A protein has these predicted regions:
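Helix-to-loop junction immediately C-terminal to a conserved catalytic motif
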Residues: 53
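Conserved ABC transporter NBD signature motif
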Residues: 57-74
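Q-loop/switch helix immediately C-terminal to the Walker
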Residues: 82, 87-103
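Conserved ABC ATPase "signature" region
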Residues: 107-122, 140
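Conserved ABC ATPase signature
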Residues: 125-132
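Hydrophobic anchor residue at the start of the ABC signature
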Residues: 139, 178
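Catalytic Walker B motif of ABC-type/P-loop ATPase nucleotide-binding domains
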Residues: 150-154
């Protein structure tokens, strides 16, 4: 894990459908620091993560990663609301795809399958999984390859208590190794975040 992991937003603004979600938002995260993003539905939590991930355009401002020689998308793992799994593929086939695509290591996926209790299900089509099992499968990509920046949108949704603990431990370990994390979550997590950002619903014009 690069010890130079960092992420900064400089006076960024987001506009969706002609509505300003947030404006002049700034933060700076150094190695080992996490940012917890909270706020009501519609305040822009998902939009913020998608902007950082390069999936939505900035209305104003700029985003910077720690290593300017590497494109920002190559520095992060993004787990959004949609699990991003192929229903027709087995759990193992989904995981193998992430390892190949991310040029990662299958040993990390093996560990994730064990910790999330997915080993006995690995040969089943992902479409047969429950909502919680699909979420656990989606989160295994965090273990498929080392990326210094984690962007997680409601990562604990549909998870049971034991799996939330696994997630908590994974985020804490990532930060302890010098990584950076931006997490939007309604569910309380035990991870100690260095910073918290509370977004508010902007009044309609």
């Amino acid at each position: 894990m690069p010890q130079t992991a960092s992420l900064a937003a400089h006076e960024i603004s987001c506009q969706r459908g002609g509505r300003l979600l947030f404006a002049d938002l700034s933060f700076a995260l150094g190695p080992g620091e996490g940012l917890l993003v909270t706020g009501p539905n519609g305040a822009g939590k998902t939009s913020l993560l998608r902007i950082i991930a390069g999936l939505l355009p900035l209305h104003a401002g700029r985003i910077e990663g720690g290593d300017e020689s590497v494109p920002l998308p190559e520095l992060y793992h993004y787990v959004g609301h949609l699990n991003g799994i192929k229903s027709a593929l087995t759990l193992r086939e989904n995981a193998d795809f992430w390892v190949d695509f991310l040029e990662g290591d299958s040993s990390g996926v093996e560990e994730a399958f064990k910790r999330f209790g997915l080993i006995e299900l690995e040969d089943l089509p992902a479409g047969l999984l429950s909502a919680g099992q699909k979420r656990k499968l989606a989160l295994t990509r965090l273990f498929a390859a080392k990326r210094p920046i984690w962007l997680l949108d409601e990562p604990s949704v549909s998870l049971d208590t034991a799996s939330v603990k696994v997630l908590d431990e994974a985020i804490a370990q990532h930060l302890a190794q010098g990584g950076v994390a931006v997490v939007a979550s309604h569910t309380p997590l035990k991870v100690k975040f260095a910073h918290e950002l509370k977004l508010k619903l902007e009044p309609l014009p």
